[in-house]
Amino acid sequence: MKINVIIIDKKGKDQLYAPLIEHYKKISKPFAKVEVIELFDKEIAKAQDISPEAAQRSYSKALEKYLGSGINIALDPASKEVDSFEFAKLLKDSVTVNFYIGGAYGFERDFLSKCNNAVSFGKITLSHKLVKVVLMEQIFRGLTINHNHPYHK
């Protein structure tokens, strides 16, 4: 199984969260190969200075090239909240799963409609760095639920 976490975020490892991301990638290896793809270019930076709508269009343009294969799931605070068991079902019986984390202005509705699903981790606002860690932990938890591993009790 292959899981991609595709995020609109400036590239580069931060000192605080990067070790946690690497930890979850490592412990997920018996179940799936997990990759994190960070996208942020001059076009996105410029668009964010113009307007929220321009920013969303630039995010869609950057993210759409990853929509071609697998199951595509956007993290969207306005979408259905899921618990860990519902999240695990999203991973079950899939060969490739792509998770999308939008930029500061979220997703265009058109991009969300191209995804197979959109889910929310709740109504709180999390930084991009932190939501990446939460997603990585939930991916590992979901994989362990699906494999009857004792991590989730």
Swiss-Prot record:
It is found in: Cytoplasm. GO terms for cellular component: cytoplasm. Keywords: Cytoplasm, Methyltransferase, rRNA processing, S-adenosyl-L-methionine, Transferase. Its main location: cytoplasm. Gene3D superfamilies: 3.40.1280.10. S-adenosyl-L-methionine binds at L63, G102, F121, G122, K123, I124, T125, L126. Its EC number is 2.1.1.177. InterPro entries: Alpha/beta_knot_MTases, RlmH-like, tRNA_m1G_MTases_N. Pfam families: SPOUT_MTase. One of its GO terms (molecular function) is rRNA (pseudouridine-N3-)-methyltransferase activity. It comes from the Bacteria. It catalyses: pseudouridine(1915) in 23S rRNA + S-adenosyl-L-methionine = N(3)-methylpseudouridine(1915) in 23S rRNA + S-adenosyl-L-homocysteine + H(+). Belongs to the RNA methyltransferase RlmH family. Homodimer. Specifically methylates the pseudouridine at position 1915 (m3Psi1915) in 23S rRNA. This is Ribosomal RNA large subunit methyltransferase H.
